[in-house]
């Protein structure tokens, strides 16, 4: 509402603040880490969904990924980012109802890479090619999604049927339709780890499972350009011999642009590395209950409970903490308001936290929180608004 | 994407379906229930956020509320609904940074009623009136929010300081600025009840606490036009003597338009009363793990865990169930995809659930789920798309 004014205290609340230099620094650090290991970063766009931060993920030439390949979580994101990026990986196994749109996007850029983990995905793409012979001008560009132990998506690399899919598109009857790019895994189970050591071990495990399967495919004579692993926790604890020992040549983190309370609790970032805050206003105070009420509820913060498995039983309910006063936490988000209590029951300073005071909330899960907003207010280190980024929305 | 086609199977997924006759019937039944008790329904708009369903909430003249008074959860909603409704209650204690916008809205319709539960709310409204003497043409219309035991917002009716606030605006130095409309409570703790009997008892408790305070104010000589209680669970189990015994003359439910899995688990509706489903596509299948993967994740369903306190320890993870096959449930939503398992571990029928098959998901919490979408596809009893409703978004 007050975009002409650069003072965040005049913003309509709830709204989201993006800390520009923090986000840029997160991007640079991830790129430097990967470059030191000799691997590409194929950054995921899903956390921020903005062209501007997508560019930050390649800034200063620290990213070895010269094709500026990116990953998106929806086809809507794919179309949105195609204005700037021409090598896009759509990271969900392709459903038949998305084949047509995916192929149109593929034709419009260098390549839209799509995922398969079942023969039905291949069949529906072949079916499209056969039914649209005039339109089918270039092969589908595909990655095999493999399950590295997360058990959400991906084919089992131990099964012969998985390798049979690769054979089918490389040497078999489907070879005229497909360009095989490589393999991809996602270690989402890293968010359930207890300690940084657990994450480190999981990183080794993902590198081994995915890397070994890449080696196996190569030993069978297949060309495997890309062996890609990831999740922000694993990408924060990569083994030094990722490329030399395991043959993994790409990582694909996403959340690291913003980080959040979960990444902090897992030990993957410091509080000052968190690049997104929700600005809220205290709408009432209840000194008799030692509580505040703010105008940011589930529709501003999301209702993700975060890493409850890492918390003391007394502080399980923690849907965000207050920036610069991390003893204060969101304990109960309703749709449009949330209750704030102090974790250790110490008295809240009501001379500081008054009706009308602004607070900044560090979210549990920045991917979900950022997605709640249509505009990001981008601020500098002096808390002045320097830009507005508009994320892609919906599907 | 295929709005010209009335077949839901051609819709881009994920998307939301609104079951027109179910929603209308929910509205009629709530109005009939209230009318039989002789009380108004002041319907809440926050669950659906659409003008069309707002009108359904007054259809067939079953609602005794002749001023067509409604409730909204944000000022953005207030402005949106002011096109159709002229008596609006903004249900969050008014923060100083929202006073100006609230007063503009108040001037533009019959009345915007705002909430107070602390003297600071009154002070900021008086401050605005004093600083804008030419603009201040009509008194602020206000409700006192009282705490009926939920302990989220509201002044304590047992404290003299609460009644002092009423005195201040009715007879005291602030009387030139305010029109006192009545009192309002919200029994959000009804969502933590174990059984319908518990909810019934809570309804009596809210009616007693709020109704008694209304009687007290009247006995002190104050005019109290409205004594309003609510929450969909409580409004589903109202005592027959709500008006005659307790003096409560208004209820303000919202979720009842759509209902959801939580309301079903609490015993407030049947599965067939749930008026909103998320349509999703199966993007992959994993027979070896007896699992499906669908393209509706936390950004389509929300990550609200629902009424975990009512569930068997084995089925705590339930972020939505499959319509017409309620043994299948969302066990793990990620940002854009979710895993589905069968609750009793029985084998999923993979001849029915194939890659590309559509499923309809009954959400845990319809208020949060509906808010994830920019368009509602409205369907009739034959599952044909008959309309598109566009909800108010953001703040």
UniProtKB/Swiss-Prot annotation, chains A, B:
Its EC number is 4.3.1.18. It is an enzyme of class 4 (lyase). One of its GO terms (biological process) is cellular detoxification. Disruption phenotype: Knockout leads to a loss of D-serine degradation activity and an accumulation of D-serine within the organism. Delays development with a prolonged period spent at the mound stage and decreased spore formation. Decreases expression of acaA and carA-1 during starvation. GO terms for molecular function: D-serine ammonia-lyase activity; metal ion binding. The keyword Transcription regulation does not apply. SUPFAM superfamilies: PLP-binding barrel. Pyridoxal 5'-phosphate binds at residues 184, 191, 232, 254-255. Its cofactor is pyridoxal 5'-phosphate; Zn(2+). Keywords: Detoxification, Lyase, Metal-binding, Pyridoxal phosphate, Zinc. CDD domains: PLPDE_III_DSD (cd06817). The modification N6-(pyridoxal phosphate)lysine is found at residue 46. Transmembrane segments: none annotated. It catalyses: D-serine = pyruvate + NH4(+). The keyword Metal-binding applies. It comes from the Eukaryota. Zn(2+) binds at residues 365, 367. Catalyzes the conversion of D-serine to pyruvate and ammonia. Plays a role in D-serine detoxification. Belongs to the DSD1 family. This is D-serine dehydratase. It comes from Dictyostelium discoideum (Social amoeba).
